[in-house]
Swiss-Prot record:
GO molecular-function term, one example from the UniProt record: phosphate:acyl-[acyl carrier protein] acyltransferase activity
Family matches, as NCBIfam families: plsX
EC supergroup of this enzyme: transferase
One GO cellular component term noted in the UniProt record for this chain: cytoplasm
Alphabetized SUPFAM superfamilies for the sequence: Isocitrate/Isopropylmalate dehydrogenase-like
Function noted in UniProt: Catalyzes the reversible formation of acyl-phosphate (acyl-PO(4)) from acyl-[acyl-carrier-protein] (acyl-ACP). This enzyme utilizes acyl-ACP as fatty acyl donor, but not acyl-CoA.
Protein name, as recorded: Phosphate acyltransferase
Organism: Escherichia fergusonii (strain ATCC 35469 / DSM 13698 / CCUG 18766 / IAM 14443 / JCM 21226 / LMG 7866 / NBRC 102419 / NCTC 12128 / CDC 0568-73)
Length: 358
C-alpha cells in the first residue's frame, strides 16, 4: 500500500475538534500508511493531541486556519468570506497537491461551492453530487446519489449522476455490471417529473449503463438496485428519514422493557433477543457508513455528517482513503469520455424545461 495524505477540516461539524481530532488519531492507528493534515486553530487542536504517541505525531501536521465557516451560513456568503477558513484551506491543500483528499463535516452548501470553485468539475459534468453507499437487506450495498448537493436537478444532471454512480458501484463497491434505477413516485413510465422521465429515456440508450427503470422509496433497502439516482432534495430527505427510523429502532432494542420487574428467565430471554436483534441490524447503524463523497470533481472530497461522533468521522476518513486508492475521479473521467457522444448530446434540447409531474 502506498502512502497517502488527507487534509481534514477539523473545525467543521457540530462538535469540531473534540470529535475530529480523536477520530484522526483513531484513523492513524488503523492505517500505518496514512498521513493527516489537521486544518484549524492550533491552540484548540494541540491539547487534543496529548495522548498521541511519537509514531502518530510523525504522521500528523497542524495547518493553521484563521476562521471557521458556520454551519448556518448561507453558501454564497460563506464562499465570499471563505479565505483563511479551515474548509477552504483544506480544499486548497488538495488543489495544490499537498493532500490527495479533503474530509469535512462543515456546511454542505459551502463545501459544494468551494470544491467546485477550487477543484473544478470533470469534463462533461455540470455539478458534483453527494453519494453514499448504504447496506441493504440482501447483505449487499446500494450506491445512492444525490444526497443534497443539488436541490433541483434537470435530466442531464440525473444522467450524469447515473453514470458516476455506476462507476463507483463497479470500481469501489466491486459490483460487476451494476443495476441503475431512478427514484420515482411509481414504477409506471408515465409517473414523475419531466426531468426523471427524460433522463429515463436517455439512460435506455446508453449501453454502458445497466438501467432497470424506476424504484420507489420503500424499496431503498431491498437490494433491487445497485445504484439509485435522485435529485438532492429528495435524496437528502429520504436518507435522513431512513437514518432516523434506524436510530429509533436500535435505541428501542436497547431500552425495551427497562425498569419493569420480570422473572429471571424472562429477563434472560429479553437480553438474548436484544443482543441477537442488535447484531442482526447493527449494519444499518448510520455511523457505520458515514461519509458522502462529492462525486464529479477533479479531486476527492468527503462530506461527513455534521453531527458525526468520533467513530463516524473515522469512517468518513476511511471513505476518503478508499476513494483515493480506487482512483474514483480518474475512472469516472474515463467512463464519461466513452459515453458522452451517446448520451449527453441527446439532452441538449431538454435544458430549460420547467419541471412537471403526473
Amino acid at each position: 500500500m502506498t502512502r497517502l495524505t488527507l487534509a481534514l477540516d477539523v473545525m467543521g461539524g457540530d462538535f469540531g475538534p473534540s470529535v475530529t481530532v480523536p477520530a484522526a488519531l483513531q484513523a492513524l492507528n488503523s492505517n500505518s500508511q496514512l498521513t493527516l493534515l489537521l486544518v484549524g486553530n492550533p491552540d484548540t487542536i494541540t491539547p487534543l493531541l496529548a495522548k498521541a504517541d511519537f509514531e502518530q505525531r510523525s504522521r500528523l501536521q497542524i495547518i493553521p486556519a484563521q476562521s471557521v465557516i458556520a454551519s448556518n451560513a448561507r453558501p454564497s456568503q460563506a464562499i465570499r468570506a471563505s479565505r483563511g477558513s479551515s474548509m477552504r484551506v483544506a480544499l486548497e491543500l488538495v488543489k495544490e497537491g499537498r493532500a490527495q483528499a479533503c474530509v469535512s463535516a462543515g456546511n454542505t452548501g459551502a463545501l459544494m461551492g468551494l470544491a467546485k470553485l477550487l477543484l473544478k468539475p470533470l469534463e462533461g459534468i455540470e455539478r458534483p453530487a453527494l453519494v453514499t453507499v448504504l447496506p441493504h437487506q440482501q447483505k449487499g450495498k446500494t450506491v445512492v446519489l444525490d444526497l443534497g448537493a443539488n436541490v433541483d436537478c434537470d435530466s442531464t444532471m440525473l444522467v450524469q449522476f447515473a453514470i458516476m454512480g455506476s462507476v463507483l458501484a463497479e470500481e469501489v463497491v466491486g459490483i460487476p455490471n451494476p443495476r441503475v434505477a431512478l427514484l420515482n413516485i411509481g414504477e409506471e413510465e408515465v409517473k414523475g417529473l419531466d426531468s426523471i422521465r427524460d433522463a429515463s429515456a436517455v439512460l435506455k440508450t446508453i449501453s454502458s449503463v445497466n438501467y432497470i427503470g424506476y424504484l420507489e422509496a420503500n424499496e431503498l433497502l431491498t437490494g433491487k438496485t445497485d445504484v439509485l439516482v435522485c435529485d438532492g432534495f429528495t435524496g437528502n430527505v429520504t436518507l435522513k428519514t431512513m437514518e432516523g427510523v434506524v436510530r429509533m429502532f436500535l435505541s428501542l432494542l436497547k431500552s425495551q422493557g427497562e425498569g419493569k420487574k420480570r422473572s429471571w428467565w424472562l429477563l434472560l430471554l429479553k437480553r438474548w433477543l436484544q443482543k441477537s436483534l442488535t447484531r442482526r441490524f447493527s449494519h444499518l447503524n448510520p455511523d457505520q457508513y458515514n461519509g458522502a463523497c462529492l462525486l464529479g470533481l477533479r479531486g476527492t472530497v468527503i462530506k461527513s455528517h455534521g453531527a458525526a461522533n468520533q467513530r463516524a468521522f473515522a469512517v468518513a476518513i476511511e471513505q476518503a482513503v478508499q476513494a483515493v486508492q480506487r482512483q474514483v475521479p480518474q475512472r469516472i473521467a474515463a467512463r464519461l469520455k466513452s459515453v458522452y457522444p451517446a448520451g449527453f448530446e441527446l439532452l441538449e434540447d431538454e435544458r430549460g424545461k420547467k419541471p412537471n409531474h403526473r
